[in-house]
Amino acid sequence: HDVSDGGLLVTLAEIGFASRCGLAVDCSGLADDPLAAAFAEELGVVLQVAEADREAVEAAFDRAGIGNRLHRIGRPTEGGHLVIRHHGAVVFDEPLSALEQVWHETSHHLQALRDDPDCADEAHAAIADREDPGLRAELSFDPAEDVVAPLINTGVRPRVAVLREQGVNSHIEMAAAFERAGFEPLDLHTTDLMADPSRLQDCQALVACGGFSYGDVLGAGQGWARTILFNPTLREAFEGFFARPDTLALGVCNGCQMLSALREIIPGTSLWPDFHANRSRQYEARLSQVEVLPSRSLMLGDMAGSRLPVVVA
């Protein structure tokens, strides 16, 4: 971490915020004045090096002619405190959780004014929760197991319609993912089905891809859905597909929003939600911890009980 605004103390604090561990630091060799050592915004960088690699790092600095600029100042500790000593005296000792809340204070006030204040308060309070284990994966399945290999080896691949519309932009990687999972992808634009709705009859699966159909001008996924609902030919084709007992459908991102707006023609969707503005009043793009609950889903059923971080936008 480079030493910049706030000097060494802020640099060490930011390292502690990210690592969720304490730091024991001795700045005696940096300056006679501990304030100068802690807050000087001079050119520098803090490196964390494994003890086994320390001699090699020191040798590299010596070869570069800057070995005298290298100072061993501390180590990570348990307890969550940033402790700084100067010639044996403790000159600073504060919990990193409290320091992070101070560090985040300005952002918190700006967020409370700009966004939903309750959401801002919740995010600010969560900083102090050092018991939060953070994002992690607890899986009920082995991700290294190739569960589709036996099916692919049969030579019979179910056909999946990779559906796209004007503004959709993730159909290529979606087709690649389904191909790797044992499907035969079929690239279909909504206008393809307007010309020949029977093409959907040859598919056992349908995936509505992500992007920004019609630029979301009519609402997220709404214009795409209404293209289907208000076109009698398309509506009949999709109703027939969803009514078949041998089909499955997946909507991702904008495609999920589109499928939600089609629920009047999809059996068993009475509990599906509408998508409204976020409570935070902002676009949210996060890496979120989710849990897979038991369900009859063909895609998620064998993953029940798993907890893992997923991208949500």
What function would you assign to each model-found segment?
Residues 212-297:
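Cysteine-nucleophile active-site neighborhood
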Residues 1-39, 50-159, 167:
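Intein/HINT protein-splicing elements and their conserved insertion hotspots or analogous self-processing inserts
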Residues 14-19, 172-187:
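Short helix-loop-beta junction
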Residues 47, 280, 288-313:
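Catalytic core of tubulin tyrosine ligase-like
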Residues 199-201:
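A short, aliphatic-rich alpha-helical micro-motif
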Residues 157-159, 184, 309:
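Residues that mark the start of a beta-strand
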